[in-house]
Curated annotation (Swiss-Prot):
The keyword Transferase applies. The gene is ribH. It is an enzyme of class 2 (transferase). 5-amino-6-(D-ribitylamino)uracil binds at F21, A55, F56, E57, C79, V80, I81, F111. It catalyses: (2S)-2-hydroxy-3-oxobutyl phosphate + 5-amino-6-(D-ribitylamino)uracil = 6,7-dimethyl-8-(1-D-ribityl)lumazine + phosphate + 2 H2O + H(+). Forms an icosahedral capsid composed of 60 subunits, arranged as a dodecamer of pentamers. This is 6,7-dimethyl-8-ribityllumazine synthase. Pathway: Cofactor biosynthesis; riboflavin biosynthesis; riboflavin from 2-hydroxy-3-oxobutyl phosphate and 5-amino-6-(D-ribitylamino)uracil: step 1/2. It comes from the Bacteria. Its EC number is 2.5.1.78. CDD domains: Lumazine_synthase-I. (2S)-2-hydroxy-3-oxobutyl phosphate binds at A84, T85, R125.
Length: 154
C-alpha cells in the first residue's frame, strides 16, 4: 500500500519559527512560507510566527512548540552564510541536529534553514533563481502534517 498526503492546508494550524539574523533573507523566506500556506488553504489566523535571534535558537522554540501539540506542523526558517571562521559549521550542524531532534515529539518539524557560501546564493534561495525555500518548507509542512494525521488513523 502506498500512502501519499494531500497538499491542502484547510484546517491546519502551523507555527513558523524564524531567525532574525540575516533578516534581509529570513524576512523573504517567511513571506514565501506564509504566501504558500495561504495559497494552499491555511487561514491567516492559523499561522503563528515566532522570532528568535539566530539559527542556533531555532531548535529550542521548535521543540517547545512541537511538545505542546497545538500545531499540526512547525516550520523553522533561518539563513547562515559562511564567513571567514568555523562558526558557520558549528551553527549549521547544531541547528540541523536540534531541528531534527525536535521532530521526535510527534509533530512534523520542517527544516527551512538556508546554508550558503555567499550572500548571492542566499538571495537566490529567497525568491530569485532557486525559488523561495520558505515556500518549499511550507509545502513540506502541509504534506507532513496531513501524512501525520493519516498515520494516526492507521
Amino acid at each position: 500500500m502506498n500512502y501519499s498526503a494531500k497538499l491542502t492546508g484547510e484546517g491546519l494550524k502551523i507555527a513558523v519559527v524564524t531567525s532574525r539574523f540575516n533578516h534581509f533573507i529570513t524576512d523573504r523566506l517567511t513571506e514565501g512560507a506564509i504566501d504558500t500556506l495561504e495559497r494552499h488553504g491555511v487561514v491567516k489566523e492559523d499561522i503563528d510566527i515566532f522570532l528568535v535571534p539566530g539559527a542556533f535558537e531555532l531548535p529550542f522554540v521548535a521543540s517547545k512548540l512541537a511538545q505542546k501539540k497545538k500545531y499540526d506542523a512547525v516550520i523553522t526558517l533561518g539563513c547562515v552564510i559562511r564567513g571567514a571562521t568555523t562558526h558557520y559549521d558549528y551553527v549549521c550542524n547544531e541547528a540541523a541536529k536540534g531541528i531534527a531532534k525536535a521532530g521526535e515529539y510527534g509533530t512534523p518539524v520542517i527544516f527551512g534553514v538556508v546554508t550558503t557560501e555567499s550572500i548571492e546564493q542566499a538571495i537566490e534561495r529567497a525568491g530569485t533563481k532557486a525559488g523561495n525555500k520558505g515556500g518549499e518548507a511550507a509545502i513540506s509542512a502541509i504534506e507532513m502534517a496531513n501524512l501525520n494525521k493519516m498515520m494516526d488513523e492507521l
